[in-house]
Amino acid sequence: IYQSYVSVVISLIIILLINDCISKISVKSIFKNGMQGIGMLIGGGMVYLVSLKVVVAVTGQKLASSYNGLTNMSQIASSKLFTFIQNAYGDWIASFISPEAAYIGGLLKVANIAVLCFVIGGLIAIFIDKNLNMLNKIMVFVLAAVLPIGMNISCILSGGMVHVLMRYSFWLFYAWALLLIQRLKHSILKEKKRFKYMASGGAVLSIAILIVIWNNFQAPNAVY
């Protein structure tokens, strides 16, 4: 799972910031938390690079320049960055809309679409909440929009050469969906009768996620 560590950390930071926005924490505090998250990423990256150079110098080994070798990252053309971002979004969406399945592909697709619909409904509930200031709402939508990129940053860093282990952070989307519905159920949704149907979203999401987990059991068994 080491190939997905960066994506996992970025995803967790974004999810925590979204939760802060919904919890009506001050913009100043949210910004501070965001800067701390970015600082942690930069600090961790610097420690990693220094450690890498030390290891290379001590062992005399050369970094791999094939497949997903670290040297390939410096060769990614900035002119293709927008294309890589588009591909990262496309790959993320395809993983949910057209998931890999051993036996229950159709049911798995329905489960994933249900999760996506509940998340979209939750974001709509946030947007119409009169008790949440507009700046918090804007930040929620911006953070939600960049979450797929955070989850699939490996697709950009590797120039599109991703495999299933590098998509490990995608599973955090299900955890975020449950967290989002729970937050809404205890704050916004109880004041919005038109969104009462989403109050039971936790149970529906749990069933959908159980279907996904069951498919994961079936897929490895079929492969092995």
Give the ranges of each region predicted by the language model.
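Hydrophobic alpha-helical transmembrane segments in integral membrane proteins
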Residues: 208-224
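Signature aromatic-anchored transmembrane alpha helix within multi-pass, membrane-resident enzymes
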Residues: 112-115, 183-213
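Transmembrane catalytic cores of multi-pass membrane glycosyltransferases
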Residues: 1-166
